[in-house]
Amino acid sequence: MLQSSKQAGIKDIARALNVSIGTVDRALHDRPGVNEQTKYRVLQMANKLGYRPNIAAQSLRLNRRISIAAILPREISHFFDPLRAGIRSAAEATVGTQVVLDFHEYPRLSFGEEEAFAKATSKHYDGIIFLPGNMRRFDPIISKLTRAGTAMMCVGSDAPNSDRIGSVATHAHVSGAIAAELLAMKMTKKANVAVFSGELSTMDHAEKLRGFASTLALQAPHLSLLPTLESHERPTAAYKQAKQLMQGRNRPEGLYLSTANGIPVLRALEELGLLEKVHIVTTDLYHALIPLIELGKITATIHQRPFTQGKLAFEKLVAYLLGEDQRQPYIRLAPHVVFRSNLSLFSSEVTDPSDAIV
């Protein structure tokens, strides 16, 4: 009777040893980047599981050349620079396949993206990593590129009704809900709160607002949510909006800065002498926030983990292009909440230039 047991592969070895697929691949093929002890463990486990290399598949993969473009905004750099770094890190760790990675930039969400796509797609890429701003404007772009044979991977947000092959982002609804709960715990008396957003036609930004509003209504009915302010990721617009809001009659006592475009708002508060008089929850982590969190001027920041988002988006896209995983990945990372008490666990990861507010 024939035995139909599945032959062990690299993934099985990696799972058994709790190491990465890349580590196993390097150890099996005697490539640099793996210490001798790990290499020995990999070879022992390969022998134990009865691993046999698939020569035909290996030959096809080694001869495969994949071209990928990352088309992303330049601003807000506190988010997009580490996102690009995550993509670059994953590309450098790719083994067994030739990957050509190009970066294309445009100024900010909903400004210059169509031109950037037109320029990038004059070259035919196997895959594109991108952040969909206005979902309605992006749907025809995604459809056109998909029909041309390009696999489209969303990162940082999503366009769920499009032909994209998958998406990687932080759970936006939960991020907004956490921010509302934090303010609700701090603000026990009747007061106004406000949300600074970027572009509500972007799913990520809209979901944060929904999560914030629904949680606030449930947990803090004594807090009134003022109309949302959209800066369209323009620092000057956010600064002017903050000045006008905080000098108005219905001045809020709590703020949720739901994108990384927080510096201009914080600067406006500092100039008005209100930075220590308002409860603030920000988004992401960059040098300018660190002293404010340390001094208690910011309650907490919701870290969207952009490096991890970029890394996973690249890895999932490559796996799809190589035929290793044809499932459409829908990955929502748990946001990390950074307080003064756990700031030291995250501050070493910050690499952006210092841009002090105070």
Where are these regions (language model features)?
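N-terminal helix-turn-helix DNA-binding module of bacterial transcription factors
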Residues: 1-63, 357
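Amphipathic helical "hinge" segments at domain boundaries
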Residues: 53-115
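Proline-centered loop/turn at the N-terminus of a beta-strand
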Residues: 67, 149-153, 166, 192, ...
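Hinge/beta->alpha junction and helix N-cap segments in small-molecule ligand-binding domains
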Residues: 73-79, 102-113, 134, 168-178, ...
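Hydrophobic alpha-helical
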Residues: 128, 132-146, 212, 227-289
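Flexible loop/hinge segments that line or gate small-molecule binding clefts
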Residues: 134-174, 286-294
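A conserved helix-loop-strand patch within extracytoplasmic ligand-binding domains
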Residues: 177-193
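Hinge/cleft segment of the Venus flytrap/periplasmic-binding protein
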Residues: 216, 305-358
